[in-house]
Amino acid sequence: MRTISYSEARQNLSATMMKAVEDHAPILITRQNGEACVLMSLEEYNSLEETAYLLRSPANARRLMDSIDSLKSGKGTEKDIIE
């Protein structure tokens, strides 16, 4: 994860925001006398929120993990997406 200081983030806010959006990667912003913060795109944030929501239910989390295991072991089926 890229790490920058609060001063650098403040001086280059627009460019820092663009980098977070374009790279689809969070940026850690540190402060000298305080806790750090993370800057990320709204798309990445929404994705994390959705994942957390889906994993909140133990049964749903188990189904998702079983599906991932099946895919990794070659038991998945590729299908075309109809838009």
UniProtKB/Swiss-Prot annotation:
Disruption phenotype: No visible phenotype under standard growth conditions. Delays Lon protease-dependent lethality upon overexpression of Lon, but does not fully suppress it. The keyword DNA-binding applies. Keywords: DNA-binding, Repressor, Toxin-antitoxin system, Transcription, Transcription regulation. One of its GO terms (biological process) is regulation of DNA-templated transcription. GO terms for molecular function: DNA-binding transcription factor activity; protein homodimerization activity; sequence-specific DNA binding; toxic substance binding. It comes from the Bacteria. Induction: Represses its own promoter; more strongly repressed by the YefM(2)YoeB heterotrimer. Induced in persister cells. Ectopic expression of Salmonella or Shigella toxin VapC induces the yefM-yoeB operon and also induces Yoeb toxin activity in a Lon protease-dependent manner. GO terms for cellular component: toxin-antitoxin complex. Has been described as natively unfolded and proteolytically unstable in vivo, but also as structured following overexpression in vitro. Has a half-life of approximately 1 hour in vivo. In solution exists as both a monomer and a dimer; the monomeric state is more predominant. It has been described as being a YefM-YeoB(2) heterotrimer and as a YefM(2)-YoeB heterotrimer. When complexed with YoeB inhibits the toxin activity. Antitoxin component of a type II toxin-antitoxin (TA) system. Antitoxin that counteracts the effect of the YoeB toxin. YefM binds to the promoter region of the yefM-yeoB operon to repress transcription, YeoB acts as a corepressor. Belongs to the phD/YefM antitoxin family. This is Antitoxin YefM. It comes from Escherichia coli (strain K12).
